[in-house]
Regions:
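A nucleotide-sugar donor-handling region in carbohydrate enzymes
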Residues: 1-63, 168, 188
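Donor-nucleotide binding loops and adjacent catalytic segments primarily
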Residues: 32-125
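A donor-sugar binding/catalytic signature common to diverse glycosyltransferases
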Residues: 121-160
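Short acidic-hydrophobic, aromatic-tinged amphipathic segments that line or gate anion-handling sites
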Residues: 16-17, 109-112, 166-171
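C-terminal amphipathic helix plus adjacent low-complexity
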Residues: 184-228
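Short, acidic/turn-prone active-site loops that include or flank metal/cofactor-
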Residues: 113-116, 152-155, 172-173
Length: 228
C-alpha cells in the first residue's frame, strides 16, 4: 500500500504504516476463557490437534472441492490424533459434496458457519488451517497458525513472501502431502508458525490515533512505523 501511494506521488511524510486494524480486533476477540457454543460439546481440544477448514470460493466448486475433501479424509484416517473442524458454507453445491466425501468420517466435525467470535477463538485453538478465504490469510498467522491456501493465486502476496501462508491449490495429492508435512515435521511447522505476520501486531488503532493527533498538532511526532 505504501509503495502504491508513493507511486501516486503522495509525499512520504504524509504516509503512516500502521498495520491492519483487523489484527487489533482479532486480539480483542480471542480469549483464553472463551466458552464455545453447544455444537462444540463433542470436540476435545486437549486430546486432538485441530485442523480448521473453510471452503467457499466459486472457482473451487465441484471437483476441486471434492479433491480437497478426499485429501482431508486421508488425513483423518491416517492421523488418529487430529480432528477436522469444518464450518460448512450454506451454498448447497458446497454442502452436497462435503456430505458425500466427509459425512461418515470419524473425527470430522461438519458444523454450520460461525459468527466471528467463535471462529476467531477456534482459529486460536487450531493446529493448522486450510482455507480458500482471504481474511483468514491475515488472521491465522497473527495467532501463530500455519495457513495452507487452497488456491493457485492470492491477493495477499505479502503473506506468501513472509512464509506465514503457502499456496497449495486443490489437487488431492498436494493438499494431503502439504498438510501431512506440517503435521509430521516440527521444524517446518515452526518455520511457518513463528514467521512474522506482515499485516499487523495488534497496535494499528493506536498508531492511527497518534497519526491523526500528530496531523492536528496534538502530538509533535507521528507513531512508530509498523515493521513486519
Amino acid at each position: 500500500a505504501e509503495r502504491n501511494l508513493l507511486a501516486e506521488n503522495v509525499p512520504a511524510d504524509h504516509i503512516f504504516v500502521t498495520g491492519n486494524t483487523v489484527i487489533d480486533a482479532l486480539h480483542h476477540t480471542v480469549r483464553q476463557d472463551y466458552v464455545f457454543p453447544a455444537e462444540f460439546s463433542d470436540l476435545d481440544f486437549q486430546s486432538h490437534r485441530i485442523l480448521l477448514v473453510t471452503t467457499h470460493r466459486r472457482e473451487n466448486l465441484g471437483e476441486p472441492m471434492r479433491h480437497v475433501y478426499q485429501a482431508l479424509r486421508q488425513l483423518a484416517e491416517e492421523f488418529p490424533d487430529i480432528a477436522v473442524v469444518f464450518p460448512v458454507h450454506r451454498n448447497p453445491k458446497v454442502r452436497e459434496v462435503v456430505r458425500q466425501e466427509l459425512g461418515d468420517v470419524p473425527r470430522v466435525h461438519l458444523i454450520d458457519p460461525l459468527d466471528y467470535e467463535p471462529f476467531a477463538n477456534l482459529m486460536a485453538r487450531s493446529t493448522l488451517i486450510l482455507t480458500d478465504s482471504g481474511g483468514v490469510q491475515e488472521e491465522g498467522p497473527a495467532l501463530g497458525k500455519p495457513v495452507l491456501v487452497l488456491r493457485e493465486t492470492t491477493e495477499r502476496p505479502e503473506a506468501v513472501a513472509a512464509g506465514t501462508v503457502k499456496l497449495i491449490g486443490t489437487a488431492e495429492a498436494n493438499v494431503y502431502e502439504e498438510a501431512r508435512h506440517l503435521l509430521t515435521d516440527d521444524a517446518a511447522y515452526r518455520a511457518m508458525s513463528e514467521a512474522c505476520n506482515p499485516y499487523g501486531d495488534g497496535q494499528a488503532a493506536r498508531r492511527i490515533v497518534e497519526a491523526i493527533r500528530c496531523r492536528y498538532g496534538f502530538l509533535d511526532h507521528g507513531p512508530e512505523r509498523f515493521e513486519a
